[in-house]
């Protein structure tokens, strides 16, 4: 029983430490930004749809979300300031 408790404690500690490590942030601008985003989206298997494809579904509630992330763009988030891969993936 003590060994199971020790293993559980060790696993929970390892999991906690791995979640506490900060994700690397970099500045991406110009071609580097475009290539990195294209590579990440391709690896993630994201098939970005155009606004016309959303309109073909005819769902009025989808239209406000087809504009993307609003006023802040990828350049604001990843070129003017460093950003993580998670932020880049959110633009796929």
From Swiss-Prot:
Subcellular location: Secreted
InterPro entries with a match to the protein in the record: Bombyxin, Bombyxin_A, Insulin-like, Insulin-like_sf, Insulin_CS, Insulin_family
Span of the signal peptide: 1-19
Cystine connections: 29-79, 41-92, 78-83
Propeptide: 50-70
Record's keyword terms, sorted: Cleavage on pair of basic residues, Disulfide bond, Hormone, Pyrrolidone carboxylic acid, Secreted, Signal
Principal location class: secreted
Cross-referenced Gene3D superfamilies: Insulin-like
UniProt KW Hydrolase keyword: no
GO cellular component terms, A-Z: extracellular space
Residues annotated with Pyrrolidone carboxylic acid modification: 20
Keyword match Secreted: yes
GO molecular function: growth factor activity; hormone activity
PROSITE patterns: INSULIN
Job of this protein: Brain peptide responsible for activation of prothoracic glands to produce ecdysone in insects.
Misc remark: Silk worm has two kinds of PTTH: 4K-PTTH and 22K-PTTH; there are many forms of 4K-PTTH.
Family statement: Belongs to the insulin family.
Self-association and partners: Heterodimer of a B chain and an A chain linked by two disulfide bonds.
Stated name of the protein: Bombyxin A-6
Organism field: Bombyx mori (Silk moth)
Highest classification ranks of the organism: Eukaryota, Metazoa, Ecdysozoa, Arthropoda, Hexapoda
């Amino acid at each position: 029983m003590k060994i199971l408790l020790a293993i559980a404690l060790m696993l929970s500690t390892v999991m906690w430490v791995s979640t506490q490590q900060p994700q690397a942030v970099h500045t991406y601008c110009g071609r580097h930004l475009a290539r990195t985003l294209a590579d990440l989206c391709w690896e993630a298997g994201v098939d970005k749809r155009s606004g016309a494809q959303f309109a073909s579904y005819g769902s009025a509630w989808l239209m406000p979300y087809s504009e993307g992330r609003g006023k802040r763009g990828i350049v604001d988030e990843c070129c003017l300031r460093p950003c993580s891969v998670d932020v880049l993936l959110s633009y796929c």
